[in-house]
Design a protein with these regions (language model features):
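Short His/Asp/Glu-rich catalytic/ion-coordination signatures at enzyme active sites or charged loops
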Residues: 49-66, 113-132, 155-197, 250-290, ...
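Bacterial N-terminal signal peptides
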Residues: 5-16
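N-terminal helix-rich structural modules
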Residues: 13, 24-26, 30-235, 247-248, ...
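Bacterial signal peptide processing site
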Residues: 18-20
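A broad, structural surface signal
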Residues: 63, 67-85, 97, 101-104, ...
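C-terminal, non-catalytic "cap/extension" segments appended to globular domains
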Residues: 29-64, 71, 230, 234, ...
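Short pre-active-site segment immediately N-terminal to the catalytic Zn-binding motif
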Residues: 483-502
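Active-site-proximal, well-structured secondary-structure segments within enzyme catalytic domains
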Residues: 172, 204, 211, 215-250, ...
Length: 712
C-alpha cells in the first residue's frame, strides 16, 4: 500500500515496497483481513464511481476527520495484528503480501487530510492536526515496535526460500525489513521507549513549523497606484482588488519573483523581499527558530540511538549518494564555479546601475531587477516578451503532446460533474493509452493560489497503480499557485514558472507510467525521484512545443525564430544566481544534519556558515532556514535537499542521450528506454542499476557542468 503524509509516516514507509506488473501475485496470496471499519464516516468509505472509484471530495467535512483518523488507525493496527499473530509459519505471501493490503482505509483518509493540509488549510484544521499529531506518532511507533510482526518479516528475509523469488520480490522484502530496522525495531525496551518519545515530539514540532510558516505566507502587502511602476499590465490585472483601486501582493514566490524583476520602486522591492525571506523569522508567535533547534536536537539524538554518528548518515544510507561526504563532494564541485559566476553577474549589473547613475550598490532585492536589464542588453531578451507566448492553457496542451509522443498517453477532459473535486478551480482529465484506448488513470489540476493553500508547486498521488490483487489505476494531481487572471483574460506565466509546470507534470507522468505489481514499490529514493521531473523540463523549448503551442496570446502568431534563438543563447543566463541560491539551501540542510546541534541558534548558525562558505552578499538561500518547509515541516527532504543536484547530474546526462539521438528529444528508441528503465519500474529496481540500463554507463557529472555553463 502507498502512504501519503498525515504526519510523516513510518506507517507510510511500512508498506512502501513491491514488484512490477509482470510479476503476478501467487494464486494463494492472502488478502489482508477485512478492516474493522464499522462507521459510515464518508472519509473512510471505499471510493465509488467511475474509473475504478474516485475520492469523494464533495463529501469532505472537517467534522468527520478527527473520528476518522482514530478509527482508521485502530483498523490498521488490528489488520497488522492479525498478520503478526498468524499461527502459520511466516511466508512471503502471508506476511509481506498481506501487509500490502492492510490500512486501505487510512490510505483513503490520508488523501483527504493531504487536501486540507496543502490545498484547503484553515485554522480549525491546523488545530485539529496539532491535536492528532501525537496520536498518529504513537500509532506509527506501535507498528514499527510490533515485535511479532517484525519477527515474521525478519524470518521471511532470512528464509532460504527467498533466493528463489524474483529480483523484484527480493527487493520488496529487503525494503520492508530495512524500513523496520532503520526505525528502531531492533532496539531494546528502553531504546524503543525513548524512540517513541522522540517521534511523538517531532510530530508535534513538524506540524507546528508548517502552521507557523503558513500563517506568515498569508500576510499580504497592499499597493496603491503610485506603487506600480514597471509592473507588467498582466501582473497588475492579476493582483488588483476588483472593488477598489488597491493591488494586493500575496507572500508567495509566484508574486515575489515578478515584482522584484519589474518593479522600479526600489524601496518597495526591499520591503517585498524582506517580507518573503523573513517568513518564520519575525521574532513573534510565528517565529520558527526555537522549533528548528529542538527538531535538530531530537533528530540527532534519534540517529545516535540507532547507531549512526549523525542524522545525515542515517538518512543517506539508502539513497543514491549513500553518505553525507559524497553528497557534499558533489555540491562543493559545483560551488566554486557558481559563486565565481555570481561575481561576474553582479559586475555586469553594477555596470548598468552605474551607467544609469542609480547611486546604489547591488543588494539582494536588486538582483532580479538588474539581471533583467542585463538579459535585455546582452541578449536583447525581454522576459515579459517571452511571457506573452507562455499561456497556461497552451502549456498544458503542450505537456499532453509531449506525454503522447514519449509515453503514448492521451488526455481527455472528464464530463463536467462526473468526478468530484474539492474546489471549483480543480479540473480533471482521463489518461488513456493512445494506441489502445485503455484507461490508465486520472490527472487532476489545481492551478491557482488562494488563502489556505500552501505556497509553491507540487504533485500528489491519490492512488498508485498495482496489479497484485487486481488492476488498480492511478489518480494523480498537479498543484500550482498561479495568480488567477480576471475572467476572460489569459493566464500568462514566466519562463521559470512554465518550467516548474513541466517539472511537476514529470512527477505525474512518473506515477502514471508505473507498472509495479505491488503498491509498495511505487515509492522512490529521494535523490532519484526528482530526476524524472527535472528531465521533463527539457521539453519546454523543444521545436515541437515552440512551433505548436508557444503562440502569442493576442495575435496567435508562433514565437518568432529570432526570439527562440535568443532564448537558447541565454539558456545559461543567471545560472550563477540560480545555482548559488539553491546550493546555499542544500548545503545548509546537510550541514545542519551533520553537526552536533546542541545549543544551536539557527539564525546565527546560518549567518556564520554562509560567511564561512563565501556566500555572495547579493544572493540569499532559496529557502532560508526559518521557512525551510522541505526540511522542517516533515522529514521528506531532511538532509536530502541536495537530491535536486544529484538528480540534475542524471538529468543533464540523460538530456545528452536525447540530444545525441537521430530523433533528438522525440527519438522513439531513447524514449522507449527512458520509460522502460527510468519511469515504469518506480522503486522495483535500484536507481543506479536502472540508470545504467538506460544509458549503458553511470551518469557523467561533467554533463552537469556543461549544462550549467560551468565547464572548463
Amino acid at each position: 500500500m502507498t502512504r501519503y503524509a498525515l504526519a510523516l509516516g513510518l506507517a507510510a514507509t511500512l508498506c512502501a515496497c513491491a514488484p512490477p506488473k509482470g510479476v503476478a501475485a501467487p494464486s494463494d496470496a492472502p488478502t489482508a483481513p477485512d478492516a474493522p471499519v464499522t462507521s459510515d464516516n464518508p472519509l473512510l468509505a471505499e471510493w465509488s464511481g467511475p474509473y475504478g472509484g474516485v475520492p469523494a471530495f464533495d463529501q469532505m467535512d472537517l467534522a468527520d476527520a478527527e473520528p476518522a483518523v482514530r478509527e482508521a488507525m485502530a483498523a490498521h493496527l488490528a489488520e497488522l495484528e492479525v498478520i503478526a499473530t498468524n499461527p502459520e509459519p511466516p511466508t512471503f505471501e502471508n506476511t509481506i503480501v498481506a501487509m500490502q493490503g492492510a490500512g486501505e482505509a487510512m490510505d483513503r483518509l490520508e488523501v483527504y487530510i493531504g487536501i486540507w493540509s496543502s490545498n484547503l488549510s484553515t485554522p480549525e484544521f491546523r488545530e485539529q492536526s496539532a491535536r492528532l499529531a501525537p496520536e498518529f506518532s504513537a500509532y506509527e511507533t506501535q507498528i514499527i515496535q510490533n515485535e511479532a510482526l517484525f519477527a515474521r518479516i525478519k524470518a521471511v528475509k532470512e528464509s532460504p526460500e527467498l533466493a528463489s523469488r524474483s529480483a523484484d520480490e527480493q527487493r520488496l522484502v529487503t525494503l520492508v525489513f530495512d524500513r523496520f530496522a532503520r526505525q528502531g525495531a531492533d532496539l531494546d525496551a528502553d531504546g524503543k521507549a525513548r524512540y517513541a518519545q522522540i517521534q511523538a515530539r517531532l510530530a508535534e514540532l513538524h506540524d507546528e513549523f508548517g502552521n507557523r510558516v503558513l500563517a506568515d505566507e498569508e500576510r499580504t502587502i497592499e499597493l496603491g497606484p503610485e506603487d506600480l511602476g514597471g509592473l507588467p499590465d498582466s501582473f497588475k490585472a492579476a493582483i488588483k482588488r476588483p472593488d477598489a483601486e488597491v493591488w494586493v501582493l500575496p507572500n508567495t514566490r509566484s508574486a515575489m519573483d515578478p515584482f522584484l524583476t519589474y518593479s522600479t520602486e526600489r524601496g518597495l522591492r526591499e520591503k517585498v523581499w524582506r517580507e518573503y525571506y523573513s517568513r518564520g523569522d519575525h521574532g513573534d508567535d510565528h517565529d520558527t527558530n526555537a522549533l528548528i533547534a529542538e527538531i535538530l536536537q531530537l533528530r540527532h539524538e534519534r540517529a545516535k540511538l540507532l547507531g549512526y554518528p549523525n542524522y545525515a548518515s542515517w538518512r543517506l544510507e539508502n539513497r543514491m549518494a549513500k553518505t553525507p561526504e559524497r553528497a557534499r563532494a558533489l555540491m562543493m564541485k559545483v560551488w566554486p564555479s557558481a559563486i565565481a559566476t555570481v561575481k561576474e553577474e553582479v559586475a555586469a549589473m553594477q555596470k548598468i546601475a552605474d551607467a544609469e547613475k542609480a547611486g546604489i550598490t547591488i543588494e539582494p532585492w536588486d538582483y532580479r531587477f538588474y539581471a533583467e536589464k542585463v538579459r535585455q542588453k546582452t541578449y536583447a531578451l525581454d522576459s515579459d516578451e517571452v511571457k506573452q507566448y507562455l499561456q497556461l492553457d497552451a502549456l498544458r496542451e503542450a505537456m499532453f503532446m509531449v506525454a503522447g509522443k514519449l509515453f503514448g498517453f492521451a488526455f481527455t477532459p472528464v464530463p463536467e460533474g462526473s468526478v468530484p473535486v474539492f474546489h471549483p478551480d480543480v479540473k480533471v482529465w482521463e489518461v488513456t493509452d493512445a494506441a489502445t484506448g485503455k484507461h490508465v488513470g486520472l490527472w487532476y489540476l489545481d492551478p491557482f493560489a488562494r488563502p489556505g493553500k500552501r505556497s509553491g508547486a507540487w504533485a500528489s498521488t491519490y492512488r498508485s497503480s498495482h496489479t497484485y490483487d487486481g488492476e488498480v489505476t492511478v489518480l494523480v494531481s498537479n498543484n500550482s499557485n498561479f495568480i488567477e487572471p480576471p475572467e476572460g483574460e489569459p493566464l500568462l506565466v514566466s519562463a521559470d514558472d512554465a518550467s516548474t509546470f513541466f517539472h511537476e507534470f514529470g512527477h505525474a507522468l512518473h506515477a502514471l507510467s508505473s507498472n509495479v505489481a505491488y503498491p509498495g514499490l511505487s515509492g522512490g529514493v529521494r535523490d532519484y525521484t526528482e530526476f524524472q521531473s527535472q528531465l521533463l523540463e527539457r521539453w519546454l523549448f523543444t521545436d515541437a512545443v515552440i512551433d505548436g503551442y508557444l503562440r502569442h496570446h493576442e495575435t496567435g502568431e508562433p514565437m518568432p525564430k529570432a526570439l527562440v534563438e535568443k532564448i537558447r543563447k541565454a539558456a545559461t543566463f543567471n545560472q550563477g544566481f540560480s545555482t548559488t541560491e539553491y546550493l546555499g539551501s542544500a548545503m545548509m540542510d546537510l550541514e545542519l544534519h551533520t553537526i552536533d546541534p546542541t545549543g544551536i541558534d539557527p539564525d546565527a548558525f546560518e549567518r556564520e556558515t554562509l560567511a564561512k562558505w563565501g556566500m555572495p552578499k547579493e544572493v540569499v538561500m532559496r529557502h532560508r532556514t526559518p521557512h525551510f518547509g522541505h526540511v522542517f515541516s516533515g522529514e521528506g527532504y531532511a538532509a536530502g535537499y541536495y537530491g535536486y543536484l544529484w538528480a540534475d547530474v542524471l538529468t543533464a546526462d540523460a538530456a545528452e542521450a536525447f540530444a545525441e539521438a537521430p530523433g533528438g528529444f522525440y527519438d522513439p528508441d531513447v524514449a522507449k528506454r527512458l520509460v522502460e528503465h527510468l519511469f515504469a519500474p518506480r522503486n522495483a529496481v535500484d536507481p543506479a542499476d536502472a540508470y545504467r540500463a538506460f544509458r549503458g554507463r553511470d551518469a557523467d557529472v561533467e554533463a552537469l557542468m556543461r549544462d550549467r555553463g560551468f565547464a572548463d
